[in-house]
Design a protein with these regions (language model features):
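N-terminal Rossmann-like FAD-binding beta1-loop-alpha1 element of flavoenzymes
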Residues: 5-32
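Glycine-rich, N-terminal phosphate-binding loop of Rossmann-like dinucleotide-binding domains
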Residues: 12, 54, 211-212
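Conserved Rossmann-like nucleotide-cofactor binding loop
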Residues: 15, 38, 214
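Active-site substrate-recognition segment that forms the wall
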Residues: 21-26, 35, 48-50, 85-91, ...
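Dinucleotide-binding Rossmann-like beta1-alpha1 core, especially the glycine-rich loop
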Residues: 48-132, 136, 286-288
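Helix-loop-beta segment of a Rossmann-like dinucleotide-binding subdomain
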Residues: 86-99, 124-172, 265-269, 324-331
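Helical element adjacent to the flavin cofactor pocket in flavoenzyme catalytic cores
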Residues: 148-198, 202-205
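C-terminal catalytic lobe of FAD-dependent flavoproteins
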Residues: 291-368
Length: 368
């Protein structure tokens, strides 16, 4: 495998491989320096949503970025499947957020009204009454009083997406080094030199840090603040059954193989990714309020995983002031943003004339 390239990407999860996919399509040579299988990897614990609604309520530019990502997703997935032969079970028929509390529902209505205004009307949501949602989803009932619906929301199998991205990148010449840990990094005469603890030496014209929670340690080597922290989420999985849900919600979805996934937790637990009885019980209770049928199903699996969170919850896209040519990319929506990371963010990395303007996502916002 090569040790010199146009780009060295540090971190080979969904974010890193999505970026690599876009760079390779532009004709760049790319090396990926990846950690071990025991590292914390949000890509493997992902809920599988490609989701817009609820994001960017207080940051309309992020809502617009996410909405664009969802709109280009069908073409992204279709092309990736054709190029690799890997089936990606992706469904974009819209999605729901269910409400059991009138005050929360009213607040969400006001928030979406303001967000739609900020986006000049380009935010095609709607709210459904309890009778409307029951007509659309007969299994939804219990204490559900209504739901929001957004047409570009959807879901997929995240492991299939990860496999397809890895397959494409390998096919197009990605040099992927596994089980590596950075030791030193410097830049001389316009070229980055990265040395790992195993002695691997990589030279690259540009560097992309997409190492998830590893950015906290790796980022400062390139002059970044590396302000990321873990947030634990827990997921419950039922036995496989025949299809009973037409569309996913932000907390309940039926996967392509028939099981129902339930997830509804945001916990500050440090780097502890274990599941807990208290949270699993709470998640199950809340889900049954919305979908009583769940009480009749057997739970067969559960897991915890760590999200990658910035201080304000928004992505960070930043070029180092100290070492220009080094870029930090981090977000907690790597699945949702995969299409735009490949298609648009890669243009920003190469300095293309059609690159998006991303200054509001930079680390500079944390200095204010």
């Amino acid at each position: 495998m090569r040790t010199e390239a146009d780009f060295a990407i540090i971190g080979g999860g969904i974010v890193g491989l999505s970026v690599a996919h876009g760079l390779l399509k532009q004709g760049c040579s790319v090396i990926c320096i990846d950690g071990s299988d025991t590292d914390f990897r949000a890509s493997r614990g992902n809920f599988g949503l490609v989701w817009v609604q609820g994001k960017g309520i207080r940051a309309p530019f992020y809502a617009a970025w996410t909405q664009n990502a969802a709109r280009i997703y069908p073409d992204f997935v279709s092309e990736l499947s054709q190029e690799t032969g890997v089936q990606i079970n992706y469904n974009q028929a819209g999605g729901y957020e269910y409400f059991t509390d009138p005050q929360t529902l009213s607040q969400r209505m006001d928030e979406y009204k303001q967000l739609k205004k900020a986006l000049n009307g380009d935010y095609p949501y709607e709210f459904l009454s309890s009778s409307q949602i029951r007509a659309a989803e007969p299994m939804i009932g219990g204490e559900t009083i209504g739901a929001s619906f957004y047409p570009y929301d959807g879901h997929l199998n995240p492991l299939q997406l990860l496999k397809a991205l890895a397959s494409y990148c390998q096919k197009k010449g990605l040099s992927h080094y596994l089980g590596e840990e950075l030791k030193t990094a410097d830049k001389k005469e316009g070229v980055f030199r990265i040395v790992t603890k195993k002695g691997l030496t990589i030279s690259a014209n540009k560097v992309v840090i997409s190492a998830g929670l590893g950015a906290k340690k790796i980022g400062p080597l390139f002059g970044f603040l590396g302000l990321v922290s873990p947030q634990r989420g827990q997921i419950l999985v039922t036995e496989k059954i025949s299809p009973i849900l037409n569309r996913p919600s932000v907390t309940i979805r039926q996967v392509d193989e028939g099981a129902i996934q339930i997830g509804d937790s945001q916990e500050q637990a440090g780097f502890n990714d274990n599941e807990t009885q208290a949270q699993m019980s709470r998640i199950a209770r809340n889900a049954i309020k919305v979908m009583p049928k769940l009480a009749q199903l057997r739970l067969v699996r559960a897991w915890g995983s760590l999200r990658v969170m910035s201080p304000d919850g928004l992505p960070i896209y930043h070029q180092s002031h100290i070492m220009p040519g080094a870029f930090l990319i981090t977000c907690h929506s790597g699945i949702t943003l995969a299409a735009t990371h490949s298609t648009n963010l890669s243009l920003w990395l190469t300095g293309h004339k059609n690159a998006p303007e991303l200054s509001r996502f930079s680390e500079d916002r944390f200095h204010a």
